[in-house]
Amino acid sequence: MWRLPGRSALRGVRSVVERRSRAEAGTHEAVRAMERAVVRCVPSEPKLSLSFALADGSHKNMQRDQSEPLGRALSRIATNALKGHAKVAAAKKSRKNRAHSSGGAACEATGPEPVATCEPVVKLYYREEAVAEDVLNVDAWQDGAVLQIGDVKYKVERNPPTFTELQLPRYIMAGFPVCPKLGVEFGDPASSVFRWYKEVKPGAAEPGDSGPASSSHSSQPSAWIETGVDERVYTPCNADIGLRLRLHCTPGNGQRFGPSRELESLCPVEAGPGTCTFDHRHLYTKKVTEDSFIRTVSYNILADTYAQTEFSRTVLYPYCAPYALELDYRQNLIQKELTGYNADLICLQEVDRAVFSDSLVPALEAFGLEGVFRIKQHEGLATFYRKSKFRLLSQHDISFQEALKSDPLHKELLEKLALNPLAQEKVLQRSSVLQISVLQSTTDSSKKICVANTHLYWHPKGGYIRLIQMEVALVHIRHVSRDLYPGIPVIFCGDFNSTPSTGMYHFVISGSIAEDHEDWASNGEEERCSMPLSHCFKLKSACGEPAYTNYVGGFHGCLDYIFIDLNTLEVEQVIPLPSHEEVTTHQALPSVSHPSDHIALVCDLKWK
């Protein structure tokens, strides 16, 4: 069972919130002493919103100018209340007429229906005194005030914690964590309360065991029972297969709670794929590392924009079951794999924008990580860091071609490249980017780290382009780690599309590359752009040189690395890669048990 740390502070209030939440979500037979009027009022917006339910059952949402006198807002509320009474009376009369026309029993009363002919009295009270009608809305609607409409009183709640977004994944599998996408205003997910229920087929549940009432679309509503999980994340078990899930949640901010909400999964829990390639790796990463260690992950997760092409299905990955290439399926595997590493830093490549915001952020945030994103064209880079260990100080992302053209740091390199216009054109056409995040330790402010993440040009004959891109990257990293933050350690992750035998890898590890290296003519003599390059870092591949980090039907090789600065960091342990038997169980990658054509690199680093 997946559980979140740091929840003990909420235990004391959870039972109170749950009792209130159940009352709110229960049947309408229980009448509350005072209704709720929710006011949203923020200084940056000209209007405030007011939300409440009238006695006729209708729900009113009003937008009023903050600078408007209270009297006008109260007058509008009175008008709405009068309309509500009129609708109730009209509905009663319509039902009576239908009864007469269908031969139904006559009503005992023969007189006309009573209809409200005047607006109800509407007042706003604060500390038991009526608020003057010339007071502006922004000042009148205070938290704890009481709105009275006729005989009905409403407690005013100004800016309570509120869910602005609440969504469950479309595809849910047994054994894989379910992470709802949350948006909370005036609150935070960590201070909110969650309770999970699972469906029981009609006739299979005892009435006393059911949870909140269902609003199922089926002819017979489902019954619900508690799962016993009261955390943000729920991992369904095999017994849940075929059942839908329900989440009951109450937003909070550590001081108070807002209106509860419920949502149900659209589809029932599906069976999982069984053992995945990363399950054995998780045995090495059961716990978050201590403060002196930095568990780092680098992973090309295979962008959906590439996985869903006809070329991918028929040429690149014809051995992969089509459903296993679907994003909804792969997201379950990616989320489980990443959260199971308990990493402090995660650098991802080939991240679709929607995957970042709708899948990765909700999942990793629930496990204590925060992320930043850099778009390339159709996909981009994402870096996540553990909030309990690091805070983000600054970002220094660049596009290689833009930096090469406009940044004075690369003026000399551009002049050399311009000696071969054809090569220069090819380099400047590439859209590759570099993501740099400077992080500061939350426990020792003197400890900072430069985390770089990139995905270099992919073409097999693009060796010289990757050399130029790496030179731009290292110069920019030097500027950040030596000029802006002198002496901070460097971790450089990515898919470098270069095996250990290439010029790019030799350049990084040895610190220089000669102008006569064969990679300068990787696409023929007409594009040769020979030049000597060197850099000041002492870098090492933290995970060594595995036989492969990319394994597809027509190719396998080591393309991914976590480069570290040997002067400031050392490797504590490398998490073993999946065995060759695991990788080839379904011929190659991706597969039903592995979500990408790449394999994640995972290692524990240590400050020197």
From Swiss-Prot:
<feature type="binding site">
    <location>
        <position position="495"/>
    </location>
    <ligand>
        <name>Mg(2+) 2</name>
    </ligand>
</feature>
<keyword id="KW-0507">mRNA processing</keyword>
<feature type="transit peptide" description="Mitochondrion">
    <location>
        <begin position="1"/>
        <end position="16"/>
    </location>
</feature>
<dbReference type="InterPro" id="IPR036691">
    <property type="entry name" value="Endo/exonu/phosph_ase_sf"/>
</dbReference>
<keyword id="KW-0496">Mitochondrion</keyword>
<keyword id="KW-0479">Metal-binding</keyword>
<feature type="modified residue" description="Phosphoserine">
    <location>
        <position position="216"/>
    </location>
</feature>
<keyword id="KW-0269">Exonuclease</keyword>
<keyword id="KW-0378">Hydrolase</keyword>
<dbReference type="InterPro" id="IPR005135">
    <property type="entry name" value="Endo/exonuclease/phosphatase"/>
</dbReference>
<dbReference type="GO" id="GO:0004535">
    <property type="term" value="F:poly(A)-specific ribonuclease activity"/>
</dbReference>
<dbReference type="GO" id="GO:0044528">
    <property type="term" value="P:regulation of mitochondrial mRNA stability"/>
</dbReference>
<dbReference type="InterPro" id="IPR050410">
    <property type="entry name" value="CCR4/nocturin_mRNA_transcr"/>
</dbReference>
<dbReference type="GO" id="GO:0035457">
    <property type="term" value="P:cellular response to interferon-alpha"/>
</dbReference>
<dbReference type="GO" id="GO:0045070">
    <property type="term" value="P:positive regulation of viral genome replication"/>
</dbReference>
<feature type="binding site">
    <location>
        <position position="350"/>
    </location>
    <ligand>
        <name>Mg(2+) 1</name>
    </ligand>
</feature>
<dbReference type="InterPro" id="IPR048821">
    <property type="entry name" value="PDE12-like_N"/>
</dbReference>
<dbReference type="Pfam" id="PF21171">
    <property type="entry name" value="PDE12-like_N"/>
</dbReference>
<dbReference type="Pfam" id="PF03372">
    <property type="entry name" value="Exo_endo_phos"/>
</dbReference>
<keyword id="KW-0540">Nuclease</keyword>
<dbReference type="GO" id="GO:0140374">
    <property type="term" value="P:antiviral innate immune response"/>
</dbReference>
<keyword id="KW-0809">Transit peptide</keyword>
<dbReference type="GO" id="GO:0005759">
    <property type="term" value="C:mitochondrial matrix"/>
</dbReference>
<feature type="binding site">
    <location>
        <position position="497"/>
    </location>
    <ligand>
        <name>Mg(2+) 2</name>
    </ligand>
</feature>
<protein>
    <recommendedName>
        <fullName>2',5'-phosphodiesterase 12</fullName>
        <ecNumber>3.1.4.-</ecNumber>
        <ecNumber>3.1.13.4</ecNumber>
    </recommendedName>
</protein>
<dbReference type="GO" id="GO:0000288">
    <property type="term" value="P:nuclear-transcribed mRNA catabolic process, deadenylation-dependent decay"/>
</dbReference>
<dbReference type="GO" id="GO:0005739">
    <property type="term" value="C:mitochondrion"/>
</dbReference>
<dbReference type="GO" id="GO:0046872">
    <property type="term" value="F:metal ion binding"/>
</dbReference>
<dbReference type="GO" id="GO:0071359">
    <property type="term" value="P:cellular response to dsRNA"/>
</dbReference>
<comment type="function">
    <text>Enzyme that cleaves 2',5'-phosphodiester bond linking adenosines of the 5'-triphosphorylated oligoadenylates, triphosphorylated oligoadenylates referred as 2-5A modulates the 2-5A system. Degrades triphosphorylated 2-5A to produce AMP and ATP. Also cleaves 3',5'-phosphodiester bond of oligoadenylates. Plays a role as a negative regulator of the 2-5A system that is one of the major pathways for antiviral and antitumor functions induced by interferons (IFNs). Suppression of this enzyme increases cellular 2-5A levels and decreases viral replication in cultured small-airway epithelial cells.</text>
</comment>
<comment type="similarity">
    <text>Belongs to the CCR4/nocturin family.</text>
</comment>
<dbReference type="GO" id="GO:0071346">
    <property type="term" value="P:cellular response to type II interferon"/>
</dbReference>
<keyword id="KW-0460">Magnesium</keyword>
<dbReference type="GO" id="GO:0006397">
    <property type="term" value="P:mRNA processing"/>
</dbReference>
<dbReference type="GO" id="GO:0000958">
    <property type="term" value="P:mitochondrial mRNA catabolic process"/>
</dbReference>
<feature type="active site" description="Proton donor/acceptor">
    <location>
        <position position="495"/>
    </location>
</feature>
<feature type="compositionally biased region" description="Basic residues">
    <location>
        <begin position="90"/>
        <end position="99"/>
    </location>
</feature>
<feature type="region of interest" description="Disordered">
    <location>
        <begin position="90"/>
        <end position="111"/>
    </location>
</feature>
<keyword id="KW-0597">Phosphoprotein</keyword>
